[in-house]
Amino acid sequence: MKSTPYMRDLLLYSGQEDNYQVSSERIKKYLRVSADDSQIHRLCIYYGTLLEDELSSLENSVVEKTTELLEDLETEEVIYAMSDGCLLPTRPHQVETEQIGSWKEMKLGRIFREKDHLNLGEKPNLIRSSVYVSHFGKHHDFTSKLSSIIDPLVKLDERLVFINDGALWIANFIAAYYPNATDILDFYHASEYLHEFSKVIFSEKKEAAQKAQWVDKQTLRFFNDEIKEVIKEIEQLKLNGTTKIKAQEKILTYYKNNQLRMLYKSYKDRGLLIGSGPIESAHRFVLQKRMKQSGQKWTKKGGQAIANIRIFHLNNQWDNVVSLINKHTSNAA
């Protein structure tokens, strides 16, 4: 079916919202027009790839979205920058005589203002507006994209707040390019390490109460900026057996590498978030909702193309997609 630019607009929008078969059915139901799912697929890959190819020329408009975050920013207000990766299933590839599929990480960044993060009490918190960036590949390519939209915020110094899981690549990136920013280790990752370690050193059922007491003691230290005391106590544990010793080494390495990012009392005193819930939820509705459905497997090109279209939609920059459609019509499927 030949399609007008407006029809392609609708097909792309539908294709980034749900899988191609569902998109085709919706178009037929709403418009009484037949749109083959393979056509929607080809259009999404074509224009999503063009978005990646022309990202440098579109970069200024993405940067403008970040610059808008600075408008009407209150004197003490902060801007959060969070990033994390989620695993997506990829297409099997031939290795000798075996078909092998794998999971690859797509990285996602989310930037938002403090005032846009709304606490709704018993309901899940709401973030009214965010700027997103994604990359299906190596972390240095992702940080290149990420830095282009964070750079306008560098003048905020400590009011630019990063919250991450402690991955070395993101820690090094922040230290190198935004040394005056506030860098926080997601509290729930810090706590998870503590709980997993406690299961190893208090492995007997009869030690359950002792385990809970020990975890509570260390958690209280977290909220008193006493990470050094936590490290010291773990170091002084006399453990026997390979499993316990390896667990001790693992948690000590993690805490020592991140201790400057674990001053949770100081962060709470400033009224800052200490958890990475916003980026975890973004993974679900930005990427997984569309890209982790039953039976889906992605190529790097296809995965990045769909992510690009979704990102421009969720960044409220669909006009860029429409401009691209009007600019490139003859070669599309």
Where are these regions (language model features)?
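Catalytic center-proximal scaffold of phosphoryl-transfer enzymes
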Residues: 1-333
